[in-house]
Structure formats: C-alpha cells, structure tokens
Amino acid sequence: MRGHQIVPEFGKRVTDVLKSMLRPALLPAPGKSFIVYDWSSIEARVTPWLSMDGDDTLQVFREGRDIYVAVAARMFNLAEADVTDEQRQLGKVAVLACGFAGGVGAFAAMGRVYGVHLPEHEAKRTVDLWRKANPWAVPFWSDLEQSYTRAIRNPGEVFTAGRVQYMKQGDHLWYALPSGRVLCYPYARFEEDGVSYAKASW
C-alpha cells in the first residue's frame, strides 16, 4: 500500500499514521493475550520524581488523594474539599500540559482535548499558577537544559540533572534514565534557535 493511500489529503504525517498502526499489527500467539494498560497519572508522577525535589506532589499519590484536586487546591489556594469540578479540570489540563515544560501553547492544545477553552491571558495565568504550585518544575527544567547543553559542549563527560544523566559520544547525545535504559538524540547540535537532533519526521 502506498503512503498516499493511507494518509488523507489533509491528514497526518506518514510517521504518525504508521505509529498508530503499530498496535493493531501486533497479534498474540494462539492461546495468549496482550494486555494493554496505562499508568495512572504518569505525567504527574514521573517528572517530580525525576527532579528529586517534588515530594509534596508524590505524597498526594502515597496518600491516595486525587492529584488533579490537590494541584488545583495549590493553584487556587483552596482546601481540597473546596475545589470545584471546573477547577479540578483546570488542574488536570495544567498537570498534563505543563509537567514537561509546556507553556501556553501546550495548555491550549491539551485544553482542546478536554474541552477547556481559555483566552490566552487566562491560559498564561493558569500556567503560571501551576508553576508556582509546583516549585520543583522550573528549576528542574533549567537543570536539564544546562546538563544537555554542557554535555554537547563537552563530549565524553557525564552531566546530571535530578535522576537523569546526559553524555555526548560521537555525534549523538545520550540520555540515561534511572531504569538503566538509554535514549539517543542522533546528531544533536546547536542551531540558532536552540539544540537540534535528527527526528523520525526528517
């Protein structure tokens, strides 16, 4: 089948279409089953843990509380019992959009998924409230940026940010996770607008 036959005229990139076709293409052996699952609130768990400075957020999970209510309560300076459904939804969108250094654009995109539509100035205010309620976030993002920048400039040396490490070897930037897995950013280099690396869409 040719690419133009599977990609609608005004649709997605070929790589996005192929990615969405991967799971349906996998078939279990006879008598076996695949189990598909999703980590609960993984976005809210992983970045504070990686930062080594997000214990307040992680404590919400330890106590079995609703993370989106807890975040909204911190954002709007309320008791958790006083958080409305609308405020919880804002907290949810903020958690999903902002944890990986997302800003107003990420908030707006995630808001569309969950039916939250705010004017730009309100979206910015909400992002700012999330960042203030999660003091581990901005310093961790800064540490990550400094670490990968220094790694690119100093090949062969290891630089740490929270629980992760960066090292440039040859043309590639390597990102070591606490699990022992290593991600590769091929041909990482500096460009005028920041760091660039080879992506599947190239």
Features from the language model and the residues they span:
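Conserved catalytic core of nucleotide polymerization and phosphodiester-bond processing enzymes
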Residues: 1-202
